[in-house]
Amino acid sequence: MKPSIVAKLEALHERHEEVQALLGDAGIIADQDRFRALSREYAQLSDVSRCFTDWQQVQDDIETAQMMLDDPEMREMAQEELREAKEKSEQLEQQLQVLLLPKDPDDERNAFLEVRAGTGGDEAALFAGDLFRMYSRYAESRRWRVEIMSMSEGEHGGYKEIIAKISGDGVYGRLKFESGGHRVQRVPATESQGRIHTSACTVAVMPELPEAELPDINPADLRIDTFRSSGAGGQHVNTTDSAIRITHLPTGIVVECQDERSQHKNKAKALSVLGARIHAAETAKRQQAEASTRRNLLGSGDRSDRNRTYNFPQGRVTDHRINLTLYRLDETMEGKLDMLIEPIVQEHQADLLAALSEQE
């Protein structure tokens, strides 16, 4: 491993020990904000520190085994130990390289999830409902909280569009690769001839930004309309114009929120989604420029980005970005998504490593 990388790892290991000591300080325990920030930093440094300690131990093992090679009686055992230690050292170096990759500052944040029915009419709306249920199940398995911000139901079930906020540890980092087009191939319930139809939905995942980081939005650039809520919520829902529609005139982005009974709360929710959408559009533009020389696994949430196909007759799910096909569709639709998310996270890390080595 390069001396510069070892020096960086030593500094991170020292910082890990320093933060550990600070977390036991009574003054810091009393300051909740500082304590939370240091706890987050400690958690982020723990894996690197642990892996580096293991790597250092393996270097000692290699040195000991090399010294034993001079002893004829110990040579055979030493050669075996040396081979094992070198293998382990290589594995740990690969892990450390991944752990040192630049982190996306948004990865630890909550996220807004939008699922929209695309081509396919009623069947697309039903599939949007299935996708939202799949993500909700996945969130449940990770103990994340799902809060519906806005929804427009399909005429025969499902959703024309649904927006939810998902809160918990590392939500955006885990779900960000879901943005893009999702295609379904199945026989709709309304199909009497048993023909397979293809429908599509788009998914967009955006990080929730703290208020201080929301893009500056000029109030003059906003058109705010109020209207009466529709859908579930009891009689009260339809008695006041509590639902809000905000249009950002420069970009044409429209956000509706009618989940709360209070117009004020709906407006606050809609503005936070609007800020996230504007930020996501700016980020996508920047990433497109950066990724012009290499592929970008992060979809834009556009229907032209074809992420996955869910083929019900064959029980098959295919991720087109990494040519991964699994015949485990039932499990996927029940929210067991790690088997699809993990390979694409690893592929993304491999791309980042390749880009770093090109720079070097």
UniProtKB/Swiss-Prot annotation:
**Keyword Cytoplasm appears in the UniProt entry:** yes
Q: What is this protein called?
A: Peptide chain release factor 1
Q: Tell me what organism the protein belongs to.
A: Salmonella schwarzengrund (strain CVM19633)
* SUPFAM superfamilies for the chain: Release factor
Q: How is it modified after translation?
A: Methylated by PrmC. Methylation increases the termination efficiency of RF1.
Q: Which UniProt keywords apply?
A: Cytoplasm, Methylation, Protein biosynthesis
Q: Where in the cell is it found?
A: Cytoplasm
Entry keyword Cytoplasm: yes
Q: Which taxonomic lineage does the organism of this UniProt entry have?
A: Bacteria, Pseudomonadati, Pseudomonadota, Gammaproteobacteria, Enterobacterales
Q: What is its main location?
A: cytoplasm
InterPro entries assigned to the protein according to its UniProt record, in alphabetical order: PCRF (IPR005139), Pep_chain_release_fac_I (IPR000352), Pep_chain_release_fac_I_sf (IPR045853), Prokaryotic/Mito_RF (IPR050057), RF-1 (IPR004373)
Q: By which gene is this protein encoded?
A: prfA
Q: Where is this region: Disordered?
A: 284-313
In this UniProt entry, the residues modified to N5-methylglutamine are Q235
